[in-house]
Design a protein with these regions (language model features):
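Donor-nucleotide binding loops and adjacent catalytic segments primarily
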Residues: 1-41, 74-78, 91-99
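Short glycine-/small-residue-rich Rossmann-like dinucleotide-binding loops
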Residues: 5, 47, 65
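Conserved donor-binding/catalytic loop of nucleotide-activated donor transferases
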Residues: 37-39, 53-64, 83
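Short hydrophobic beta-strand element within catalytic cores of glycosyltransferases
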Residues: 44, 60-70
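Acidic, glycine-centered active-site loop in nucleotide-sugar glycosyltransferases
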Residues: 57-58, 74-86
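C-terminal "capping" alpha-helix adjacent to the active site of nucleotide-linked donor transferases
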Residues: 83, 87-90, 94-111
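A short, well-ordered alpha-helix in the C-terminal region of glycosyltransferases
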Residues: 105, 112-126
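C-terminal alpha-helical cap of glycosyltransferases
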Residues: 125-139
Length: 139
């Protein structure tokens, strides 16, 4: 699955077709849980919502933080990297060659992805809504 927005949609459809790769390309998905539940690995920016969703679904991830977000995305990505759930690459270094270099061991050694997925177990789960209700109700 490749989410790309409107600008690159036609180029990506043709590119995957030319390469003989069976990919589903979407400009947008409202039901992201369908995409996440069918994923073994995600390549993503590192916005707070994306990081939260990826952590919720416990999907190994390669983050390419958006460099113009005042380092917020890098900070978000490093949280999962430090736990062993993510690989982080700076956008300046991100290209087809660097992605291939990162992907090859992940594709050829299933233990790497398995260990990345297991590393999510070490991340505490917070239920912010429930905690807020518990704090507010006695008032």
């Amino acid at each position: 699955i490749h989410l790309c927005g409107n600008i690159d949609y036609d180029i990506l459809i043709e590119g995957y077709k030319d390469l003989g790769i069976n990919f589903k390309v979407f400009t947008f998905l409202e039901q992201m849980h369908y995409a996440y539940s069918g994923s073994n690995l995600v390549v993503s920016r590192a916005g707070a919502i994306s990081v939260s969703e990826i952590a919720y679904f416990k999907i190994p991830v390669i983050f390419v933080p958006y460099p113009y977000a005042y380092e917020h995305q890098m900070s978000n990505a490093l949280v999962l990297k430090e736990k062993g759930c993510a690989i982080v690459i700076d956008q300046k270094e991100f290209n087809a060659g660097s992605l291939r270099f990162i992907l090859e061991p992940l594709i050829t050694d299933a233990e790497i992805l398995k260990n990345m997925r297991l590393a999510f177990e070490g991340i505490p789960k917070y239920n912010a809504a429930e905690s807020l209700v518990r704090e507010v109700m006695p008032l």
